[in-house]
């Protein structure tokens, strides 16, 4: 089912165009405009491989509901894929380019996990640190035994949003943290996995703030982005970068039996309405609201794929990364109703497909974005899009449709780079 758009012409009446016709024309324009800029913005890109991947992105925009897409990949520490297609803002006729920022929903969690592991390393923390040692209020209503390990593994028992929550709370960090601290656990601490869609970011981010003194947004910028030269990873977009942000569009609503109360998304999945607000774009939402370019996300994972170092800059010791990716649970998730391989903040690889690798880790997000590292292949990859659908369909999210855009793009990257899969 396609929306109709009116196209002005020289006659007295307007011609009605389908969404697909509009997007096809805009995508062709955007692709033509970007062809000459690929190698100038990413000098390490192999043009042959990049052209193959870009063609796949363009076909997704033309033949499916997808609107704007980016993918970037590092191999052996070098940027080898940096491709994009489609529109960042269809209404304004603004195409995607390599610098466009996308709201990547829960893909943000993987970057947040990296911040937490670096905080643990810098401050000599234990993953079994009781949260109440740094955040006493969190112990209310039977949560006094919750630990940092549980927070990273979605086992603090509070996946539900605070009482009275509305999307306006997303731009009020202190209010969200007070509300989460006052929650009563729905599941036994440390015994049941229940995906903390929003709460994961606030719980871990507040632990970091109380330990380190900086917000997690500041920590990400100062400890990861600046040392690695990443331009395109934000937990709250500054004023100067607002013009880079892609407009989010909602796809079909969540299934009728989906309990939106637990993940903080309104019934019917009006995600775009909330996350297209300037106040929300500029808020720190480390569980599900980071804004990234695929290039920035991939560079972060390239560092992890090389066990903590990139371009001679060491961010994390290899031992810390190995501790962070150690499997914590492969149990039934009470929210998503699938078995999920979870490390400390990262998802682990699938049983089949490109990520059937013993060392692959990363995270997916609603809408189908993803980022991951595969040290065995020395690969870091990021995929961004602005058409938001309920199911992630991600390469690191086993059980999703095999022909989801995320899997199609992953396969295209592997094929273009002639990587085994």
Segments from the language model and where they lie:
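N-terminal secretory signal peptides
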Residues: 1-17, 30
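Catalytic loop of the DD-peptidase/beta-lactamase superfamily, centered on the K-T-G motif
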Residues: 2, 44-87, 192, 209-231, ...
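N-terminal export leaders
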Residues: 18-27
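Short active-site loop at a secondary-structure junction
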Residues: 59-72, 91-151, 188-198, 285
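Active-site helix/loop module of the DD-peptidase/beta-lactamase fold
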Residues: 98, 103-107, 119-163, 181-182, ...
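Recognition helices and adjacent regulatory flanks at domain boundaries
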Residues: 165-170, 178-182, 186-188, 193-195, ...
């Amino acid at each position: 089912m396609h929306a109709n758009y009116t196209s002005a012409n020289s006659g007295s009446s307007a011609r009605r165009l389908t969404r697909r016709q509009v997007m096809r024309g805009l995508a062709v324009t955007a692709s033509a405009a970007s062809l000459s800029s690929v190698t100038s913005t990413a000098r390490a890109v192999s043009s042959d491989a990049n052209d193959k991947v870009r063609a796949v992105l363009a076909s997704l925009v033309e033949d499916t509901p997808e609107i704007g897409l980016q993918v970037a990949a590092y191999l052996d520490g070098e940027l080898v894929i940096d491709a994009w297609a489609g529109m960042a803002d269809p209404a304004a006729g603004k195409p995607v380019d390599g610098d466009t920022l996308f709201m990547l929903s829960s893909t943000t969690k993987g970057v947040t996990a990296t911040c937490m592991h670096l905080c643990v390393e810098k401050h000599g923390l234990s993953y079994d640190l009781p949260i109440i040692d740094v955040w006493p209020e969190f112990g209310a209503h039977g949560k006094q035994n919750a630990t940092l390990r549980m927070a990273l593994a979605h086992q603090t028992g509070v996946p539900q949003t605070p009482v009275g929550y509305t999307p306006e709370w997303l731009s009020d960090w202190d209010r969200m943290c007070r509300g989460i601290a006052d929650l009563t656990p729905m599941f036994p601490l440390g015994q049941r996995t229940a995906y903390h869609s929003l709460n994961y970011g606030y719980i871990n981010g507040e632990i970091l703030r109380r330990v380190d003194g900086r917000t997690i947004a500041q920590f990400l910028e100062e400890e990861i982005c600046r040392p690695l030269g990443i331009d395109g990873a934000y937990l709250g977009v500054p004023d100067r970068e607002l013009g880079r942000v892609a407009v989010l569009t909602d796809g079909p609503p969540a299934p009728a039996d989906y309990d939106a109360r637990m993940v903080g998304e309104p019934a019917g999945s009006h995600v775009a309405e909330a996350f297209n607000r300037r106040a929300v774009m500029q808020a720190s939402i480390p569980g599900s609201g980071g804004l990234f370019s695929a290039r920035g996300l991939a560079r972060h994972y390239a560092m992890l794929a090389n066990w903590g170092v990139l371009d001679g800059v060491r961010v994390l010791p290899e031992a810390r990364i190995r501790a962070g990716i150690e499997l914590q649970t492969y149990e039934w998730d009470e929210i998503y109703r699938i078995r999920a391989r979870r490390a400390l903040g990262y998802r682990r690889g699938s049983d089949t497909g490109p990520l059937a690798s013993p060392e692959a880790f990363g995270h997916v997000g609603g809408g189908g974005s993803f980022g991951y590292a595969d040290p065995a292949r020395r690969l870091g990859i990021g995929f961004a899009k602005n058409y938001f659908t309920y199911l992630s369909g991600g390469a690191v999210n086993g059980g999703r449709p095999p022909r989801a855009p995320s899997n199609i793009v992953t396969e295209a990257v592997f094929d273009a780079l002639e990587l085994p899969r």
